[in-house]
Amino acid sequence: LVGGKFRSEIRAYASQLQSGWAANRGKCREPQEDGEAALKAREEGYDCVKYDFFSYAPDGREYHGEDYNRILSPATLRMLEARTAAVREAMGPDGDIIVESHARPNANAAIQIGQALEKYGIYYYEEPNTPTPKMTKYISEHVNIPLASGERIVTRWQYAPYFENNSLRVIQ
């Protein structure tokens, strides 16, 4: 924006694939559907996708606060892992996956989700919970995935504590 042209291309990612992709728009309820949406995006040339794996339950209902504002059950974690594994398979080892949480989980659930998904080589974990400097630092100390935020942090003064405590790796 200031200082002249720096690059001729920028990278874009396919976003919110939990709602399907292209002609396959609709709620992804099963891991196979998540994988198919990622594969469609990959075929269109995207090498990075962003998902909220905690949007739609297998029965089609939307998840709500009571589903992710608590310690998550082993069955829930297996479901999140199965969905992530399907997307990882579709994207291949070199494709990037961004996990989106819309700041909904509490800290316990955010940590559980992050730890369960670490093995899938997640590019970054966006808004794992409602951001506060201390809570974001706490989550960053328990999850080995770069954390991102920005939809709820908007000024340089609001970002300062996150830079000072080194809890965010990506700002948006």
Which sequence ranges carry the predicted segments?
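Glycine-enriched alpha-helix->loop->beta-strand junction motifs that scaffold or abut catalytic
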Residues: 45, 115-123, 140-148, 163-171
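Thr-Gly-centered strand-to-loop micro-motif
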Residues: 126-127, 149-151
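Metal- or metallocofactor-binding catalytic centers and their adjacent structured scaffolds
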Residues: 1
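Residue-level detector of flexible, active-site-proximal loop/helix-junction positions
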Residues: 5, 19, 154
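Catalytic cores of alpha/beta
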Residues: 107-115, 154-166
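Metal-dependent enolase-superfamily TIM-barrel catalytic cores that perform enediolate-based chemistry
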Residues: 14-133, 137
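Phenylalanine-focused residue identity feature
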Residues: 6, 53-54, 138, 163
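Short beta-strand/loop segments at the ligand-binding rim of alpha/beta enzyme cores
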Residues: 5-12, 90-100, 140-150
